UniProtKB/Swiss-Prot annotation:
The keyword Metal-binding applies. It comes from Salmonella paratyphi C (strain RKS4594). This is 4-hydroxy-2-oxo-heptane-1,7-dioate aldolase. GO terms for biological process: 4-hydroxyphenylacetate catabolic process; phenylacetate catabolic process. It holds the Pfam family HpcH_HpaI. One of its GO terms (molecular function) is 4-hydroxy-2-ketopimelate aldolase activity. The gene is hpcH. A divalent metal cation binds at E149, D175.
């Protein structure tokens, strides 16, 4: 068994990604052909569930782009289900300390190394027990990325980096800026200083730093500092802003007056 995303991180080669929030296998396949190294299937802020994650994994599978799946929480039950449908690389949100990082790793490993439940006969991940010796190979193929998104997590970064089985640490600029008192302003100098320091610290510890940043100069700056997995856009934003720009070129103005509410 191989995990190309994990192998590339270990080799120290940067990977450029795109965030998927449309929760749709058709758009996921469309974007899988765009050339990004990795695609993040978001279960935290997008309307995904295990079934929609499965269909997107199937849609991306024929393409070189590598899928990364973000569950809604650091929950071993949810993690087990995502691994069984074929996710190998997980991005665990809102990890605050080393204990939570250890819990995330344990949820991805079969016993005795962890607590992942054994159900390989039912699992796409094992090709329904068609992969020889899957139970003994699976642990090494798992890639665990944890998100640090608060001042508390930043203060615990050194101990998080010491946790065996953590392959990368992803800095969440939106939540971090809010926690630091600069909601909606991840480009504030204090936030940027925290991000840059974290990238350097993560890389120095032998782990892979990651981030989502649609601002192109900042994304390139993070890559220069040593970030190894950087998402540079979001599918919903590309679609919304692209459609708005096209409409504007023909003199069409946005009109939301008929919208009665969020429903």
């Amino acid at each position: 068994m191989k995990n190309a995303f994990k192998d590339t991180l270990k080799a120290g080669r940067p990977q450029i990604g795109l965030w998927l929030g449309l929760a749709n296998s058709y758009s996921a396949e469309l974007l899988a052909g765009a050339g990004f190294d990795w695609l993040l299937i978001d279960g935290e802020h997008a309307p995904n569930n295990v079934q929609t994650v499965l269909t997107q994994l199937q849609a991306i599978a024929p393409y070189p782009s590598q899928p990364v799946v973000r569950p809604s929480w650091n929950d071993p039950v949810q993690i087990k289900q995502l691994l069984d449908v074929g996710a190998q690389t997980l991005l665990i949100p809102m990890v605050q300390n080393a204990d939570e990082a250890r819990n995330a790793v344990a949820a991805t490993r079969y016993p005795p190394a962890g607590i992942r439940g054994v159900g390989s006969a039912l699992a796409r991940a094992s090709r329904w027990n068609r992969i020889p010796d899957y139970l003994h190979q699976a642990n090494d193929a798992m890639c665990v990325l944890v998100q640090i998104e608060t001042r508390e997590a930043m203060s615990n970064l050194a101990s998080i980096l010491d946790v065996d089985g953590i392959d990368g640490v992803f800095i969440g600029p939106a939540d971090l800026s809010a926690d630091m008192g600069f909601a909606g302003n991840p480009q504030h100098p204090e936030v940027q200083a925290a991000i840059e320091n974290a990238i350097v610290q993560i890389r120095a510890a032998g782990k892979a730093p990651g981030i989502l940043m649609a601002n192109e100069p900042l994304a390139k700056r993070y890559l220069e500092l040593g970030a190894l997995f950087v998402a540079v856009g979001v599918d919903t934003t590309l679609l919304a802003r692209g459609a708005e720009a096209l409409a504007a070129r023909f003199g069409v103005e946005k009109n939301l007056s008929g919208a009665s509410g969020v429903y």
